[in-house]
Every structure is written in structure tokens, then in C-alpha cells.
Amino acid sequence: MTELHLEARHLVMIEQMLQEFIPEARVWCFGSRVHGRGLKRFSDLDLVVRDEEDLHAKLGKLRDAFEASDLPIKVDLLEWNQLPDWLKQEIFEEYVVLQEPAKAAI
């Protein structure tokens, strides 16, 4: 598994917000926080939501939560279905699964 270049306490905050707002979604991290090239202390965190369901309203609330949080970095939250093919290919080359969809209780 590829290491995620992020402080553990920040990762916990991000995972908690993902679970609160979009527990049903698969979320991948990509970019400099994954591969480490060009990484700076305050580099943003690139996340992509890989879900066929329309989560636009929930993602807006999640974006607001990220902005209002105590995270010292910016979180860019993208939707897979809106990405160009070249960026999808770039993400496929190196990513970290941050969240898998929550399973419904049986």
C-alpha cells in the first residue's frame, strides 16, 4: 500500500468527516499527498469520490465542513464522473483508498 503523506491526526479528522457526510461513497486520495513529488508542508489534499449516485448536495456540505475545520491544509473534493479521462488515468496510476462504502446493517 502506498503511504499517505499526512499527519495521523489530520487523517482521522478527514475520515470522520467522510463517514459523517458520505458514508456510502468510495473515496480515493491522489496527487502529491500520495506520490510525494513536489510535496510541501501545506500542499492540498486531493480526494475523488468514486460513486455513481448523485451526491452533489452532500458533497457541498462536506466541502463546507472541510473549509470550516481546523485542518491546516485545503481539501480538494472532486467527483469521478466529472473528471476528464486523462486525469482518471493519472489517478489510476497512483492512489490510496481512503474510504470504502459503508455496508448496510443486516
Where are these regions (language model features)?
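Catalytic core of pol beta-like nucleotidyltransferases
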Residues: 1-26, 34-41, 50-106
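Short, well-ordered beta-strand segments
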Residues: 46-48
